[in-house]
Amino acid sequence: MRSYEMNIETAEELSAVNDILASIGEPPVS
């Protein structure tokens, strides 16, 4: 289940990156 936990962490990091990109008007990272 460790890989599952890592996937959650990665998703949270991508969400944070998307928030930053959105704040500067860039399209979100998929």
Swiss-Prot record:
Name used for this protein in its record: Tail tubular protein A
Organism superkingdom: Viruses
